Amino acid sequence: GSRDSTLTKMKELAAAHDNVRYISFSRNFGKEAAMYAGLSHTTGDLVIVMDADLQHPPAMIPEMMKGIEEGYDCAAARRTTRAGESKIRSAFSNLFYRLSNHMTDVKMPQAAVDFRIMTRQMVDSILKLSEVERFSKGIFAWVGFDTKWYPYENVERTMGTTKWSFRGLFKYAIDGITSFS
């Protein structure tokens, strides 16, 4: 779904390196579909999920690996700040977590993000779920694997702008709450 030169660069990398693969969609099907497709094509013992816009700092990966080495099935990040976001978006995000944790049986830490390292066992459990409308943050919590949380300070995007509209985020929040209530 990306409209920049990402696909061209991925094709070049895949041609040069046998261990690089990519998935290309005919259009933008959304973050959840992209994550599910990515997870379903993984083969390794460990899987890292992170945003490509560098809002999830790759430099955290070695520290997060320590959680996996300690025996956790998941090492995940959560924001300590919401730098780069409007106050209204931050307020609605905080409200979402409070409502979701109050109204559902799935408890998600405040400011949890999708940036995480997961074991193959956890990924396989996620892939067995048949949800059509997926809400990954909830699914990651619902499958019940031990998770170690790593705080990080949110950073502003280095390039581009978010494609999430307020309406899209609101629908995503409603889907997240109704999926687990």
Regions found by a protein language model. Give the residues of each.
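Short, conserved catalytic or interaction motifs in soluble domains
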Residues: 27, 52-54, 152
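Alpha-helical membrane-interface segments at transmembrane helix boundaries
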Residues: 174, 178-181
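Histidine/lysine/aspartate-rich catalytic loop segments that bind and position anionic ligands
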Residues: 145-147, 153
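A conserved acidic beta->alpha catalytic loop
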Residues: 1-8, 54-55
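Acceptor/aglycone-binding surface of glycosyltransferases and processive sugar-polymer synthases
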Residues: 12-13, 19-27, 31-41, 46, ...
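Beta-strand scaffold of nucleotide-dependent catalytic cores
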Residues: 137, 149-150
